[in-house]
């Protein structure tokens, strides 16, 4: 039993610092643009898209790595970056809106 408690404590010590180091980044959707248009984050970080326009938008990766579906006006959507790579994304409703999420 004592060994099991020690194992649980060691595992908790290994897991907790990773979560504590994760950062949150914000992409603002406004005036038919994603701001910033290019964002680089680390694996495990969270990205929040906030729609400040008066109509819905999406944040949809070209390779379907993520898809917010409709983000209503004054609403938000978040995504945890789990896989490294370069993710070009756009708004399905307004195809001229493009941006890039880099995950290191």
Model regions: which residues?
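Extracytoplasmic copper-binding redox domains, predominantly the cupredoxin/blue-copper superfamily
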Residues: 2, 10-11, 17-104
